């Protein structure tokens, strides 16, 4: 077996942990879309999201591989129209996040402040089977497994925005309006 390379290095290796699955027997396209929905989520929210996907309470938006995907009302929260509930992909991603969480505990990181910094799904080598057709023909029956990698990073609490009373907003005017005022001599 060759050395495992991640497609990206963590920003701070002391405050992050990694997990990886290779040659997983789960559809690449479904897993890719589910992983893209998880990108940037806190770990606890991502786990809850995947559990909700398994129960059909939340949906995975299909943005890239959306050919032939039906429309669903739940996708409105993602500002798109097409989505599905890929249960097997959710199971595999939950297992991978659980593995990354245990790696974080072993490393001594605060599990409640972990955020998915990087998640990537890549195509693995296809597995070939055969299906028998009419008139003695044989067609390929291929599977599309994938490699999944995830990097979790520990993030501090986000600083809240200042209220509107603290700093008055500066009104920006368009360039066209400024030119018009300059031509009139109002500027």
Swiss-Prot record:
InterPro entries: Ribosomal_uL22, Ribosomal_uL22_CS, Ribosomal_uL22_euk/arc, Ribosomal_uL22_sf. Residues 159-187 are annotated as: Disordered. It comes from the Eukaryota. Keywords: Ribonucleoprotein, Ribosomal protein. The keyword Ribonucleoprotein applies. Residues 172-187 have a biased composition (Basic residues). One of its GO terms (molecular function) is structural constituent of ribosome. GO terms for biological process: cytoplasmic translation. It holds the Pfam family Ribosomal_L22. Transmembrane segments: none annotated. Residues 159-171 have a biased composition (Basic and acidic residues). PROSITE patterns: RIBOSOMAL_L22 (PS00464). Coiled coil: none annotated. The keyword Ribonucleoprotein applies. Gene3D superfamilies: Ribosomal protein L22/L17 (3.90.470.10). GO terms for cellular component: cytosolic large ribosomal subunit. HAMAP family: Ribosomal_uL22_A. Belongs to the universal ribosomal protein uL22 family. PANTHER family: 60S RIBOSOMAL PROTEIN L17 (PTHR11593:SF10). This is Large ribosomal subunit protein uL22. It comes from Caenorhabditis elegans. The gene is rpl-17.
């Amino acid at each position: 077996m060759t050395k495992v390379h991640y497609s990206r290095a963590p920003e701070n290796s002391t405050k992050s942990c990694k997990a990886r699955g290779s040659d997983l027997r789960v559809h690449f396209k479904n897993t890719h879309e589910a992983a893209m929905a998880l990108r940037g989520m806190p770990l606890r929210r991502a786990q809850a999201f995947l559990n909700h996907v398994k129960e059909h309470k939340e949906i995975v938006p299909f943005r890239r591989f959306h050919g032939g995907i039906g429309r669903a009302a739940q996708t409105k929260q993602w500002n798109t129209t097409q989505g599905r509930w890929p249960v097997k992909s959710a199971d595999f991603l939950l297992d991978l996040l659980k593995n990354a969480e245990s790696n974080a505990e072993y490393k001594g990181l605060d599990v409640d402040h972990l955020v998915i910094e990087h998640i990537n799904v890549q195509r693995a080598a296809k597995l070939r089977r055969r299906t028998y057709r009419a008139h003695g023909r044989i067609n390929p029956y291929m599977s599309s497994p994938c490699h999944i990698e995830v990097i979790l990073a520990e993030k501090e609490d986000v600083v809240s925005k200042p209220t509107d009373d603290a700093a008055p907003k500066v009104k920006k005017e368009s360039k066209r309006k400024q030119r018009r005022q300059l031509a009139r001599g109002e500027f």
